[in-house]
Amino acid sequence: FATKKKQQVAISDSDSTRVFTKVPIHNHWESMELDEKNPKTLGWLQVAYWNESKKMVSNDVCASVIGFLKQKVLMDESSKIENVHLRCAYVNDEIYYDLGIRGWKFVKISANGINFVDYGIDSPFFTRTNKTGIQTIPNLRPDGNALDELVKLIKVPNPEMFKVHLISMFVDGLPMPCFAIRGHAGSAKSSTSSMIKRIVDPSGNSNDSNLKSFPHGEDNFVVSLSGSYLSAFENISHIDKTTTNMLCRAITGGAFEKRGQYTNGDVFSINIKRKILINGIDFQIKESDLLDRTIQYNLERIPKEQRLSEKKIEKIFQKLLPDILGEIFLILQKVLKIIDSVEDSLPHTERMSDFTIFGEAIYQSMGHKEGEFSKLYDSELKTYLQNLHDSNPIVKFCEEILGDNDEIEMTAEQVFKKISEIASRENYSDGGLPKSANGVRAWVD
């Protein structure tokens, strides 16, 4: 019975231990994971069997059947391996967006138009998690300029870059920079972060349901990312090298280890590429690899006379949201018309090349001239590097050691001695200075 019901079975290309299938439910199609521990899959099989046979079967029987079907697929060398999408898919020059509603309705964007479509046998494979919330139905005939109204509402300091960055989040499968939002109390960083999440990949209607704490350890990080297309991490205070490495791999796509379900020591590899947002009061991004993979937004504290209540902000946002989505989708339709020619016209870049290409196409589709986005993006990156340079205390010491020279050859021990002499003379006690010659070597590395 279960074998007849399942259609288009596929192994996930990002996690070779997971198997998905498409099944008919009432008058539409859905994807199910063949997992004997998944309550939704168990419930589907029990109800489907009852509807045809009027017989009840236990959870144990259903779990055995589903487990058998899964292993059969995994052991069959002819089984298809496919990308199983979450919320968004960019396939064959078309963008699919899962609205998260019952009945599995999607928005399909192509160069020729935008349509509301049903999920079906010919659709790309999608899955949903308990974090896949319902999205507002977009208004494809938006009134006014909703994106401009949004940036006024959140008072973002670099609005043109923000709009391009936000729209790029709907392009699945390609690395796009992380949102890095800083702001003290009263700057609305949490509200801003929640609105971004709710525009792209809502998990609910409140800040609490859309924002989460950064997880401890790589295993928890992978689990946290796996549940959402866009993960928004709240109140980041410090980004160490381990966190930097995990974020970089998740942004551009990389392999993470995953423990097997059994105590046999087996370790599997899971490939993760996700859209990410982080916010905090005053975290610093010190590694150039992560710096290249983020766009930073420093929100100013909003004066008391300009502050709005959460209820008022929510009312404005809810009114704007259908038009924001409609405007974004219409811009993406224009992007798909010109993306190939834009890619051919741009010089090769080593840093976030896919974002550079799509950013340029998005900016042109918003009415700007060719090449203007590349200048805007380069200016942003240079500002980040300059701020990193200015905020690093050792740089100022090295500049004094160099004096008028362009280059001096010194050992790490000699550099440490000089830094210590200058710090003592200037009564400088910043904890960011190297504590030894090895500290100098680590800083250089």
Per-region residue spans from a language model:
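Short beta-alpha connecting loops at secondary-structure transitions
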Residues: 231-234, 306-317
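DNA transaction DNA-binding modules
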Residues: 5-26, 30, 37-40, 44, ...
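N-terminal nucleic-acid engagement/recognition segments and initiation subdomains in replication
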Residues: 1-141, 145, 223, 330, ...
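Conserved catalytic/switch belt of AAA+ P-loop NTPases
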Residues: 201, 244-268
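A short helix-turn-beta junction within AAA+ P-loop NTPase domains corresponding to the substrate/partner-engaging
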Residues: 286-304
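AAA+/SF3 P-loop NTPase mechanochemical coupling elements
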Residues: 221-224, 260-278
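Conserved AAA+/SF3 P-loop NTPase catalytic/coupling segment centered on the Walker-B
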Residues: 229-251, 283-292
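P-loop NTPase catalytic core of nucleic-acid-dependent motor ATPases
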Residues: 113-227
